[in-house]
């Protein structure tokens, strides 16, 4: 259910874009992201910080897109979100509180050097996605950008997550590997 809620705004954005335009899709994205927050709180009695930050960015950049009737704002939002993810990972690493380890460390007890490698891997991934988004958003058609945002970035993130799990599994202690099989 949680994963469905996470994809709800993206699916709504895509569907509304296909039937209307980028401005209707942006308005729908703002509403869907707000509904996501409310539903998440209703179901789980808490809202993750990242969801609040994402909503703030969607609401502000989406509103700017609608007020100025300029899709550049919503296109930049994607790159800014990826930049914030990368900055958060770097900050956590330098402050001695690796974010990936805090999220997955109990289930995947691997050495700190593995967590550090994964952190930098994800930082590079987020930076690459942000830069590629800029290229696609401002060099190719709007429709190409929407498809890239919805399918390309989602697929890249899923593949990256799978590669991360495989890498972590490879470095797990043998007893933990048996437990997970």
UniProtKB/Swiss-Prot annotation:
Keywords: Cell inner membrane, Cell membrane, Membrane, Transmembrane, Transmembrane helix. One of its GO terms (cellular component) is plasma membrane. It is found in: Cell inner membrane. The keyword Cell membrane applies. The chain crosses the membrane at residues 19-39, 50-70, 80-100, 118-138, 148-168. It comes from the Bacteria. Its main location: membrane. It is a multi-pass membrane protein. InterPro entries: YciB. It holds the Pfam family IspA. Belongs to the YciB family. Plays a role in cell envelope biogenesis, maintenance of cell envelope integrity and membrane homeostasis. This is Inner membrane-spanning protein YciB. It comes from Shewanella amazonensis (strain ATCC BAA-1098 / SB2B).
